[in-house]
């Protein structure tokens, strides 16, 4: 499935949005009309920019309050549609997304709606265009995807298809099993969004609290399994209305979005997300915290060593080539790094004395790194000295590092290989035995980012 995101999901002007979408690695983009209206250029300019960035323009949206209108509004609706078709031809897209009517003037009836969609399909076909029909969860007469599918089915037009939007489906708690019976070639667009479960009206919920897949509470894996049974292989697009996202870094939010789509397709049989889709290694099981590393200067290192000793930790070794000491109690390993070169030194300059890295023992360190990189985590590496072991690592919260170790590679010998044993007697009994959990502090606005980051890479749940 082609990965896509609607421009309404991001902050910034249209050029900034398109640049961020392309840089993140999306295959396509949905153009939201407001972004086009505020752009200082022509629709043709927008289309050229999209193509120059290597993106496909998936759809132009939204076209509102169309089906079921009485005269003279019905005639005007078709006139509006023709003007949208003009824009689409300039933009270079063949798909117009039509939302179910919310106008109090609209008339009900699936046959009436189907007739209108069929006529719109005729007009679109004459210009080589297509129509995708979506049921808004607050639609006046059509608010259920099963009804929007019935309208499309009755319209019986090759240029008229269905939009499945996970928010509108799940906000109404509609059963998902009917999706599997819809022919995949009649689904023209799939829009995915997650959200926390909230008791509020659907419109406000939709406009302010949508989030990326994996950040909310919707059963999106079940949706994807049903979608896979249809044979659908079209765009999988994010349409996210979220106040926080629209005030955050355009590039970071776009990257989170693509990560969420890759994660959404992970492990779903018959689903390949992205034009360069590949099978991911399984989620990493973090067996234990292998070590915690502190970045400090020399004076603080002495004070920290005294504190550790007072807490019952014993110095087990000193690094053979660096100003680094290893302290241990039970299965807890603490590292004090006051070396004047390398990552820890730079981290201390920026952050002051602090934890700069956490090492996690996993089943397979290389596979964990591969999965993390496939999910767009930034890998970390630095120069490795003679006799040292290179540990796989990724960037974590606040620019810190997360290292990966395992039992079946040279990583299991890192303490013996890199450290000279301390000449101290070891006490027989430890009062502290293990690290129970790792807790990170972060800005509130970063919570959803790091939630998705860690739960997509590791076998973790949300509490």
For the regions a protein language model found, what residue spans apply to each?
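Acidic-and-aromatic substrate-binding clefts and catalytic sites of carbohydrate-active enzymes
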Residues: 8-15, 32-43, 65-75, 103-108, ...
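Conserved beta-strand positions in the central sheet of alpha/beta enzyme cores
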Residues: 30, 59-61, 97, 132, ...
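Histidine-acidic metal/acid-base catalytic patches
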Residues: 1-4, 11-25, 51, 92, ...
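Active-site acidic/histidine proton-transfer and metal-coordination neighborhood
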Residues: 15, 67-161, 171, 252, ...
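Conserved beta-strand positions
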Residues: 5-7, 29-31, 98, 133, ...
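Glyoxalase I/VOC metalloenzyme domain signal
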Residues: 14, 23, 75, 252, ...
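A structural motif
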Residues: 26, 55, 88, 93, ...
């Amino acid at each position: 499935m082609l990965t896509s995101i609607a421009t309404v999901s991001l902050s910034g002007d249209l050029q900034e949005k398109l640049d961020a979408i392309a840089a993140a690695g999306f295959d396509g983009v949905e153009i939201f009309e407001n972004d086009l209206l505020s752009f200082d250029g022509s629709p043709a300019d927008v289309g050229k920019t999209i193509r120059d960035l290597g993106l496909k323009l998936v759809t132009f949206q939204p076209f509102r309050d169309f089906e079921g209108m009485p005269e003279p509004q019905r005639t005007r609706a078709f006139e509006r549609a023709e003007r949208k078709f003009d824009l689409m031809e300039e933009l270079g897209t063949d798909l117009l997304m039509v939302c179910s009517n919310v106008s109090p003037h609209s008339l009900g009836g699936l046959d009436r709606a189907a007739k209108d969609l069929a006529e719109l399909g005729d007009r679109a076909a004459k210009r080589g265009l297509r129509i995708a029909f979506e049921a808004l969860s607050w639609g006046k007469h059509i608010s259920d995807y099963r009804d929007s599918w019935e309208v499309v089915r009755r319209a019986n037009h090759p240029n008229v298809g269905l939009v499945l939007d996970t928010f509108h489906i799940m906000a109404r708690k509609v059963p998902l099993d009917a999706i599997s019976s819809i022919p995949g070639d009649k689904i023209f667009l799939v829009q995915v969004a997650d959200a926390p479960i909230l008791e509020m009206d659907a419109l406000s919920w939709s406009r302010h609290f949508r989030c990326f897949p994996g950040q909310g509470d919707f059963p999106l894996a079940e949706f994807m399994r049903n979608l896979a049974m249809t044979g659908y292989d079209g765009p999988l697009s994010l349409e996210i209305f979220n106040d926080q996202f629209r005030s955050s870094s355009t590039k970071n939010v776009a990257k989170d979005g693509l990560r969420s789509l890759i994660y959404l397709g992970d492990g779903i049989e018959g689903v390949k997300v992205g034009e360069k889709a590949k099978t991911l290694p399984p989620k990493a099981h973090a067996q234990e915290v292998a070590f915690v590393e502190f970045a400090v200067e020399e004076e603080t290192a002495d004070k920290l060593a005294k504190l550790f000793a007072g807490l019952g930790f014993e110095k087990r070794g000193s690094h053979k080539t660096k100003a680094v000491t290893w302290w241990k109690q039970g299965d807890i390993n603490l590292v004090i790094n006051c070396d004047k070169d390398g990552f820890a030194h730079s981290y201390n300059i920026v952050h002051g004395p602090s934890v700069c890295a956490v090492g996690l023992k996993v089943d397979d360190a290389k596979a964990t790194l591969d999965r993390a990189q496939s999910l767009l985590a930034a890998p970390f590496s630095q120069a490795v000295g003679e006799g040292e072991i290179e540990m796989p690592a990724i960037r974590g919260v606040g620019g810190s590092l997360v290292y990966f170790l395992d039992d079946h590679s040279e990583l299991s010998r890192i303490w013996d290989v890199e450290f000279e044993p301390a000449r101290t007697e070891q006490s027989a009994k430890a009062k502290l035995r293990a690290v129970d959990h790792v807790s990170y502090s972060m800005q509130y606005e970063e919570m959803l980012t790091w939630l998705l980051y860690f739960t997509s890479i590791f076998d973790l749940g949300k509490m």
